A protein has these predicted regions:
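Ser/Thr-rich, low-complexity intrinsically disordered terminal regions
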Residues: 1-114
């Protein structure tokens, strides 16, 4: 049985909410891509520059299976008003770490762009 977690505006921890910034989505997309490449245990599986979606795999550990992570940047073209959404899904393993996987991306991403 798998698990999942995605950023949600109702979360009390701001790092678990979608990130809204007055930045162009292309800049956030590039910053997100660079961060994924810098994170150990993360692999960038694909980057759809038109849809502004990164598909990643976060390697699992001894008890947790690998997580499939989608990072989606939305916002209007040419206007600095963007939102970053992150979703993690795990299909196997004894432990479900999806919330921790989202935090593993969002905490350094906040430092990088805020």
């Amino acid at each position: 049985m798998g698990g999942s977690f995605k950023t949600d505006p109702g979360q009390s921890n701001e790092r678990l909410r979608p990130l809204r910034l007055a930045m162009r989505r292309e800049h956030l997309f590039e910053a997100a891509k660079e961060l994924v490449e810098d994170l150990s245990s993360w692999v960038l599986d694909g980057a759809d520059e038109e849809a502004m979606v990164l598909s990643c795999t976060r390697a699992g550990g001894l008890l947790a299976g690998p997580s499939k992570v989608k990072i989606h940047i939305e916002g209007p073209d040419e206007i600095p008003n963007s939102t970053v959404h992150v979703k993690s899904e795990t299909e196997s393993g004894l432990l479900k770490r999806d919330k921790a996987v989202v935090l593993e991306f969002m905490v350094p991403f906040h430092r990088r762009v805020c």
